[in-house]
Regions:
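Cysteine-dependent hydrolase recognition
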Residues: 1-259, 263-272, 280-282, 288-313, ...
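N-terminal non-catalytic regions of secreted/periplasmic and cell-surface proteins
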Residues: 314-344
């Protein structure tokens, strides 16, 4: 989920400007169990952003069960060597929620250099070393080395970043792949374009793979999210110092989110394409996450080699569905005898 402050309405209060919708979205992602919460912007040890989108009180009261890794490319969010209470320490020490680890800064840092070390850390912490997810401590070491060997001096912020948490801990990354084989009977990546139209029904088939082979022993549950085409989002230019409105691309519409079973490494699901699509020719996106019944195997994958645009010709059906009601059993007849607590 990409959340850009200025894309949402700013509210002026007696204590300063606020983005209530942004605060709600971030807390929602935290509660839902995001794998990583990554923030880039202004901050201090007691709040994130000038607009107090999240405060140290929020990190103290989070009650989420699935703990994310928090990353803050921001000034002074976790100066743990001071006597002040900090967001980083509070998130890590929250016994009811917060974060599994916190990677952030202890001193002032500069935005231009932040993006390089932030991207490097993300790349490594989401990668594998010797077939296993890279530990957070190793990801930090590799990220700090990366900014040294780029051919430019991008090391200015390097010593300000620290990891609060167990350096031997790694994220619970999926180790198997999910592949979408066909949509509406057409092979993905084939010669014929796959087009999903508003009002149509899509039938998707796929597999869980290991080293180019179907993982036939995988049985469990998969969750699929289908997103609409990318669209240009223009921010509101609510910051007085901005010369122009910031623009970025995002997939803002979720067309389907649902789960189904995986049997012998194979799955299929069906969904109706809603009518409120973007109606701009472009590729859609399917994300799939699967977990085995015993929760020991994880798989994920994505597919964007299909298009979403246009409308399906839908037959005008003005006749409502038939509904049949009965008590206890479908063979019930009107006026029949039932017990004192019949099942309706």
């Amino acid at each position: 989920k990409k959340v850009m402050w200025d894309a949402y309405t700013r509210v002026s209060t007696s204590t300063g400007n606020r983005y209530p919708e942004v605060s709600r979205l971030l807390k929602q992602q935290q509660q839902a169990g995001a794998l990583i919460m990554d923030y880039a912007g202004h901050g201090v040890e007691y709040q994130i952003s000038h607009e107090s989108v999240l405060t140290i009180s929020d990190f103290r009261t989070f009650t989420n069960q699935n703990l994310p890794l928090w990353i803050t490319a921001s000034c002074d969010v976790m100066p743990f060597d001071t006597r002040k209470e900090t967001i980083g320490e509070t998130a890590l020490l929250n016994a009811q929620g917060g974060s599994v680890a916190f990677w952030g800064t202890t001193r002032t840092v500069y935005a231009y250099y932040n993006k390089f070390i932030n991207n490097a850390f993300l790349r490594h912490v989401l990668s594998f070393t010797n077939g296993k997810p890279t530990t957070m401590g190793e990801a930090q070491r590799l990220a700090k080395n990366d900014v040294i060997s780029t051919g430019q001096d991008r090391t200015l912020n390097k010593l300000q970043y620290s990891l609060l948490g167990d350096p031997a801990l790694a994220l619970n990354l999926p180790t198997f792949d999910v592949v979408i084989d066909s949509i509406n009977g057409l092979p993905v990546g084939g010669k014929q374009d796959i087009i999903l139209k508003a009002g149509s029904v899509a039938r998707v088939k796929g597999r869980v793979m290991r080293q180019e082979e179907t993982l036939a022993g995988f049985n469990g549950q998969m969750t699929a999210t289908v997103r609409d085409t990318r669209e240009m989002v223009t921010c509101k230019k609510q910051e007085e110092t901005s010369n122009s409105a910031f623009q970025y691309y995002d997939r803002q519409k979720v067309l389907f989110n649902g789960s189904d079973s995986v049997r012998n490494g194979e799955f299929q699901f069906t969904f109706a394409v809603p009518f409120d699509i973007n109606y701009a020719s472009g590729s859609g996106l399917i994300n799939v996450y699967a977990v085995s019944d015993d929760h020991t195997q994880l798989a994920h994958g994505a597919e964007d080699r299909f298009f979403i645009y246009g409308s399906e010709t839908v037959r005008n059906d003005s006749i409502g569905p038939s509904i049949y009601c009965y008590l206890n059993t479908p063979s019930f007849v009107e006026g029949g005898s039932v017990n004192t607590t019949p099942y309706f």
